[in-house]
Amino acid sequence: MAFKFKTFAAVGALIGSLALAGCGQDEKDPNHIKVGVIVGAEQQVAEVAQKVAKEKYGLDVELVTFNDYVLPNEALSKGDIDANAFQHKPYLDQQIKDRGYKLVSVGKTFVYPIAGYSKKIKSLDELKDGSQVAVPNDPTNLGRSLLLLQKVGLIKLKDGVSLLPTSLDIVENPKNLKIVELEAPQLPRSLDDAQIALAVINTTYASQIGLTPAKDGIFVEDKDSPYVNLIVTREDNKDAENVKKFVQAYQSDEVYEAANKVFNGGAVKGW
């Protein structure tokens, strides 16, 4: 029995060693990378980057899809993925501040303008007093939306709010609009809500129901927006070869052409 136990223990130890060795190889493999993206239009763009990465750089890109803005950074921080491509710098900065993530940008992708959409009105002149306006509830995209509402004259924010105003910073509201904060994935569905007259939606989610800023937006964020999307990884992974190869693949003409096709001209090159 003692002999058998030693044999099984040795076999178990060998299997464990091989498993650990395999994990180490996967983590350091310069020709493989796991990248988190948001399901939908951005996923389609990333799939082109995936193809370019394989053909030009011999890099196998495994895309991991998410349905919200919170989980991709959580997964990256835990080491479940090697990089993600979905967020702009103000959002990344806020996540780092709030959650203590050790994440860093390694490349820029595109600006995807936010816009105001509606199934109830065709112009802001038709927006009635007391109407409900839906906006994303995460701090950076909420601020981005409020700044856009101010730019088109619907509200006025107090001076000095920078990029992160909240509803409490509204000092003038001529139409007595009711700002309704929702999770970003819920915003497209809010357009069918009888109570919601207008919704400010990120291009990523608007495209999931066939909407584009240039064609369907009642008002659209300027193309000189500071909210360029980023490729992000962990600080201890920023110099990895697989990350560098993926950035090169993403910042290619093929991906730029695909983004413009997917977003009907709504993607602006950020690099």
From Swiss-Prot:
Lipidation (N-palmitoyl cysteine): C23
Disulphide bridges: none
Single GO BP term: amino acid transport
Domain of life: Bacteria
UniProt subcellular location: Cell membrane
Signal sequence bounds: 1-22
Keyword Membrane (UniProt): yes
Coiled coil region boundaries: none
Lipidation (S-diacylglycerol cysteine): C23
InterPro entries named in the record: Lipoprotein_NlpA
Function: This protein is a component of a D-methionine permease, a binding protein-dependent, ATP-driven transport system.
Family assignment from sequence similarity: Belongs to the NlpA lipoprotein family.
Protein name listed in UniProt: D-methionine-binding lipoprotein MetQ
Organism: Salmonella typhi
Gene designation per UniProt: metQ
